[in-house]
Amino acid sequence: MCVPKDVPSQPRRKRDSSNFGHRFRGSHQIFSLRRGLGHEGECSSASPSLCYSLGMTRGIAKQNLPVVGVFFGLLAVSLGGLVLLPPIPQDQSYHQFADQRTIFGIPNFWNVVSNLPFLAVGAAGLRRFRNDPATVVFFLGVFLTGIGSSYYHWDPNDGTLFWDRLPMTLSFAALLALVVEERVNARAGAILLWPALAIGLFSLLLWRWNDDLRLYFWVQFFPGLAVLVLFLLYQPKYTGTHYWIAAGVLYALAKLFEFTDGAIYSVRNFLSGHTLKHLAAAAACFAILRYFQTRRLITWPSARPVGLPLPKA
């Protein structure tokens, strides 16, 4: 091509490849961050390296294998100990509660109406949280506990006790899955939910078929122990750990009230330990509800991806 002499040719500018690459990597990481954050900011498996850079899955990369070993070790030891125990039949004196007063035509009045908080907490959770199966199952179990426990305390016997324990088993299984989702990995928690529910249901059927409560007691005991281990070994992904601690303390208090039913009732003959157990357990469920209502995603400024600003305090 001819170029007139009075028009100087312009040299072609070189593309700054390093700057272009930097901008591309920054925008790609931002896109990956948006893609990697699922419902309510949870890390998905789409971009585990990016999640790790934010500190969301630090425990997975550093502690996954040891914790899996601890988890299955606890599982094996607890189940092994269960086999060594003799069968545990349902003690019929369990149905003889200290407070058996009939008020307004309702037998065992306070043990029945003290289940109303379960209905309120469960309904609030179901109304607010509908996307995660484990969360739905947990609050569904809490809601149904209000119905099943009221039904049982209206006429305490083994048949009605089954419908009291069934929804509690749903909540125990879902609680373990929730903590695995929150502390370890969302996918692992979602997978764990269904076998945990199956084991819980089987434990109740085994009790009704063979009058053996060993597996049911394990279903109550093991999730609490596993949750404690997970809390000790894994970093939280969300704020609000104090709500989990409050829930644990309140549930322990509920079990204490259960074992001191008559002693508490004998003090004033007003409220029994079992009534207080219902209120403390419902308060524990409320603490978990508050956790889900108020939690915020925790980010780690020291390991932020390139191109992303520091999070505001």
Q: Language-model features: where?
A:
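Early transmembrane hairpin module of multi-pass membrane proteins
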Residues: T57-L193, G200-L205, W209, Y238-A313
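Charged/polar low-complexity intrinsically disordered segments
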Residues: K5, R13, Q29-I30
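Active-site rim beta-loop-alpha module in soluble metabolic enzymes
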Residues: L205-Y238
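Short, low-complexity, charge-dense intrinsically disordered segments
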Residues: R23-G26, R35, E40, A46
